[in-house]
């Protein structure tokens, strides 16, 4: 089989290699999956760069999220379509613990299935963690990202008002159409001024995917006693925290990682999360964008396309 690996951490376009390997044999608790589609997430790039919360054991395969079909399993018939996460999905076959497989809902395409877990469950989980209620205000950074679009749509269904930031004013109308209340171009508009005009006391919560100065400006938009969940670092810069702001406004800043949150859930909560998120994704009201697809052998083109500014949809490796 073909697989994409890296023997050292660094820029994906520089360190990734395509090699031939034997198809693995599943152990008793595992299933062999033929992968049919993968999407590229920020965590994939950070993992290759050695910047993620999981340290790669070199040489390592890349990719965390995929959709595929069961090839061998003691529990599922051959050909059963499944969704899963694993370390190293940029390959043709992978062995996955059978208990971690999620059957793909009937009618869900591979284009959606291969991105049905990481971003949608993150959006859902952060909304659950925040405790936001109908009528409250949420500010998110990276509003035009796949995660941002899902937060906007899920929040709208809950009656939560969303303000989001973008780096390109051309993206504003599309996000308004999805349900954002206000969209702010951080390159040309004053975020704090716009937020204060809409919500004089400040927003109830902030979800930050960017970090750096943009994260600091978002933090300053919180109301007294507000809460900020930090889950991304797209800027690769730390947030410069204003201690006085934290103290006198009694603000709470927390890290949020999907892996830790998911592991904290009981089985019933996991079932409910999957059911609710997949219901969202299967409704015609929810938009899941794909910009471009590449073959596994075109992985370098895929990572270059992923890193282009102004992208409006996911990059898939099929």
Predicted regions and their residues:
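Glycine-rich beta-strand-centered segment in the early N-terminal region that forms part
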Residues: 22-39, 49-88, 95
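C-terminal hydrophobic helical "lid"/dimerization subdomain
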Residues: 34, 266-318
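Short glycine-centered segments of the SAM/dcSAM-binding site in methyltransferase folds
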Residues: 81, 137, 161, 226-227, ...
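NAD(P)H dinucleotide-binding glycine-rich loop of Rossmann-like/cofactor-binding domains
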Residues: 81-143
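Short, glycine/polar-rich helix-capping loops at beta-to-alpha or helix-loop-helix junctions
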Residues: 89-92, 167-174, 238-243
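Mid-domain Rossmann-like dinucleotide-binding core that forms the NAD(H)/NADP(H) cofactor-binding site
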Residues: 120-188
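Short amphipathic alpha-helix with an adjacent loop that forms part of the alpha/beta core around
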Residues: 190-200
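Glycine-rich phosphate-binding loop and adjacent beta-alpha segment
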Residues: 213-283, 318
């Amino acid at each position: 089989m073909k697989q994409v690996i890296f023997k050292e951490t660094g820029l994906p376009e520089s360190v990734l290699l395509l090699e031939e390997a034997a198809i693995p044999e599943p152990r008793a608790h595992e299933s062999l999956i033929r992968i049919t589609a993968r999407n590229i997430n920020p965590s994939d790039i950070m993992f290759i760069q050695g910047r993620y919360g999981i340290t790669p054991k070199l040489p390592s395969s890349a990719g965390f999220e995929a959709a595929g079909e069961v090839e061998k399993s003691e529990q599922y018939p051959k050909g059963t379509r499944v969704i899963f996460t694993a370390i190293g999905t940029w390959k043709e076959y992978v062995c996955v613990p059978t208990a971690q497989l999620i059957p793909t809902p009937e009618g869900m395409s591979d284009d959606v299935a291969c991105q049905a877990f990481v971003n949608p469950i993150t959006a859902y989980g952060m909304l659950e963690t925040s405790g936001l209620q109908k009528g409250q205000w949420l500010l998110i950074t990276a509003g035009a990202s796949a995660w941002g679009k899902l937060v906007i749509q899920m929040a709208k269904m809950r009656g939560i008002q969303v303000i989001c930031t973008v780096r390109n004013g051309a993206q504003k109308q599309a996000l308004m159409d999805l349900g954002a209340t206000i969209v702010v171009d951080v390159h040309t508009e004053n975020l704090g001024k716009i937020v204060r005009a809409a919500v004089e006391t400040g927003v109830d919560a902030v979800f930050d995917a960017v970090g750096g100065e943009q994260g600091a400006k978002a933090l300053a938009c919180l109301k007294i006693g507000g809460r900020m969940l930090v889950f991304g670092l797209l800027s690769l810069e730390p947030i410069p925290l204003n201690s006085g702001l934290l103290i006198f406004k009694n603000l709470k800043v927390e890290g949020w990682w999907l892996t830790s949150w998911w592991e904290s859930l009981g089985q019933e909560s996991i079932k409910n999360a999957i059911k609710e998120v997949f219901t969202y994704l299967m409704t015609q009201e929810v938009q899941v964008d794909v910009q471009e697809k590449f073959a596994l052998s075109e992985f370098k083109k895929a990572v270059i396309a992923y890193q282009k500014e102004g992208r409006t949809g996911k990059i898939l490796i099929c």
